[in-house]
UniProtKB/Swiss-Prot annotation:
It comes from the Viruses. The gene is 47. This is Putative protein p47. It comes from Acyrthosiphon pisum secondary endosymbiont phage 1 (Bacteriophage APSE-1).
Length: 190
């Protein structure tokens, strides 16, 4: 099947130079060319050989593919094992880190609660102090109000006494004037 192409022109020229007529040289070169073309056509034996070659290649490829599959399956299984181990390690590490974070958060939350309790105690103490101050102020205000009441009561009693005195004086003055009026009008006639 690995034949060289036939040059019909060159063959007819060579035949002519050998002394064969031009027409015969052309006819001979055409016959040789056709036979040469027929020689390029595959025979049943060629086809059978190619089929055997293809079957051999298929067998080889099937065997190689099976080997590759086997190798890939083994490698995939190894990778799965490795990944499973790595995932387990990562989970373990994450669990440990999460536990540490929880511990830290619990400690911080406890500290915040203590701080809040202290602040609430301080606030409660401040509120108690404000209440005491307010009670003291109310007591002082009540004492001042009662002093003012006493002063007002004393002043009122003084004003009442003065008022009584003024009434007596007015009454005595009016009686004195009445007695003078009576004397002036009634006495001259006597």
């Amino acid at each position: 099947m690995g034949q060289v192409a036939f040059d019909a022109l060159q063959a007819s020229e060579e035949l002519e130079s050998a002394g064969i007529s031009r027409e015969k040289a052309r006819a001979i070169s055409l016959v040789v060319r056709k036979s040469h073309d027929v020689a390029n056509v595959a025979t049943k034996a060629d086809i059978a050989e190619v089929k055997r070659d293809i079957a051999d290649v298929r067998k080889d490829l099937s065997a190689e593919i099976a080997d590759v599959r086997k190798d890939l399956s083994a490698e995939i299984a190894d990778v799965r094992k490795d990944l499973s181990a790595e995932i387990a390690d990562v989970r373990k590490d994450l669990s440990a880190e999460i536990a540490d974070v929880r511990k830290d958060l619990s400690a911080e939350i406890a500290d915040v609660r203590k701080d809040m309790a202290i602040r609430f105690e301080k606030t409660d103490a401040q509120i108690a102090d404000v209440r005491k101050d307010m009670v003291n102020l109310f007591d002082k205000t009540d004492a001042q109000i009662s002093l003012v009441r006493k002063d007002l009561q004393l002043e009122m009693s003084g004003i009442r006494a003065e008022q009584k005195l003024i009434r007596w004086m007015l009454g005595a003055g009016i009686l004195g004037i009445l007695s003078l009026v009576v004397k002036a009008f009634l006495m001259p006639a006597l």
